[in-house]
UniProtKB/Swiss-Prot annotation:
It holds the Pfam family Prefoldin. It is found in: Cytoplasm. It comes from Thermoplasma acidophilum (strain ATCC 25905 / DSM 1728 / JCM 9062 / NBRC 15155 / AMRC-C165). One of its GO terms (biological process) is protein folding. Its main location: cytoplasm. Heterohexamer of two alpha and four beta subunits. This is Prefoldin subunit alpha. The gene is pfdA. One of its GO terms (cellular component) is cytoplasm. It comes from the Archaea. GO terms for molecular function: unfolded protein binding.
Length: 130
């Protein structure tokens, strides 16, 4: 196999790996967003006798959470706004759809890269047979 073809295949493999990593990251984000939607949508939090609140670095404190009042939501650049639980759920559902759309775009890119890899590989294999 020619060096330039091998380099091209290695490059395509690295792109596929990068896309796979991005898909994995987005899948994890999607799970987190869905969990938050579920938490805000059902009454389990209110009926739970013990609530643990993350205070960072893997530490938790017992506390009370009231989600019937406005939630404090970051909107960027250190700015926060108050938002109703219902509005937060709507926003999170939109975020979830955006994540799904991004995953689909990445899956399409991955398919294109795999097709490109297979084409380069098959072309080189055909050349070597002759």
């Amino acid at each position: 196999m020619a060096r330039d073809v091998e380099a091209q295949l290695n490059y395509i493999e690295s792109l596929i790996s990068s896309v796979d990593s991005q898909i994995d990251t987005l899948n994890k984000a999607m799970i987190e967003v869905q969990s938050t939607i579920d938490l805000l949508s059902n009454g389990d939090l209110a009926s739970s006798p013990e609530k643990l609140i993350s205070i960072g670095s893997g530490l938790f404190a017992k506390g009370n959470i009231t989600i019937d009042e406005d939630l404090i939501v970051p909107i960027g650049s250190g700015i926060y706004v108050a938002e109703t639980k219902e509005r937060s759920v709507e926003r999170l559902k939109k975020n979830l759809e955006d994540i799904k759309a991004s995953i689909q775009k990445l899956l399409d890119q991955r398919k294109t890269l795999v097709d490109q890899y297979n084409t380069v590989y098959a072309t080189e294999a055909t050349r070597n047979v002759k």
